[in-house]
Amino acid sequence: GRGMAKAYKQAVSLFESEIKNRKVKIDINERGIIISLSNDVYFKRASSDLDIDTARTVLEKISLLLTKTELSDKQVRIEGHTDKGPTDPDGPWETNWDLAAERALNVLKYLIDFGVNPANMAAVSYGEYQPIPLLNDDTEEGMARNRRVDVLILRD
C-alpha cells in the first residue's frame, strides 16, 4: 500500500549518503522494502563479525526506521547471502550457508540491541543460491555485489 511507498521514500532519504557511496542499496518490490548491506563494507574479510565502527551508523538508521515509523509493526527478515566462491577449508564455516547464516544473525542481534522488537525479526540464510538477477557472478564485481545481507521489511 501507500504506507510502504512512503516508508521507502523515508528510507532512501535516511540512507542518502550510504546509497551515494554504494555502501547500501534500497529497493521496493512485491515482497517489501529491501535494505541491502554490502558484506565487503560492513563485515571483516572472511569473517561473520560486523565491523561495528563502520556498521554502527547504518544499523542505528535501520533500527530508527523499524521503531519510529509506520514500519514498527512490520515483520523483518534478515537474509544472508554469499558469492558462489568456496569457503576457506581451514575456516570456521563448512559451507556458504553457515557463513551467510552467521552474518544475518549478527545483524539481527545488533538491531535488537538498538531497540528493534525481537518478536518481529527472523534470520535466514540463502548461501550462494539467491544471486542478484541479471548479475554476472563470474566477475569480481558481481561476486562482491552478491556478498550481502538484506534487511527485508515485509508487506502485510
Task: Indicate residue ranges for each PLM-predicted region.
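Juxtamembrane linker/hinge segments adjacent to a transmembrane helix in small membrane proteins
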Residues: 1-34, 38-40, 44-46
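Short secondary-structure junction motifs
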Residues: 21-23, 73-75, 118, 146
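Periplasmic OmpA-like peptidoglycan-binding domain that tethers envelope proteins to the cell wall
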Residues: 42-62, 67-69, 81-156
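Short acidic/polar alpha-helix capping motifs at helix-coil junctions
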Residues: 29-30, 74-75, 85
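Residue-level detector of alpha-helical recognition elements and their boundaries
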Residues: 26, 74, 136-138
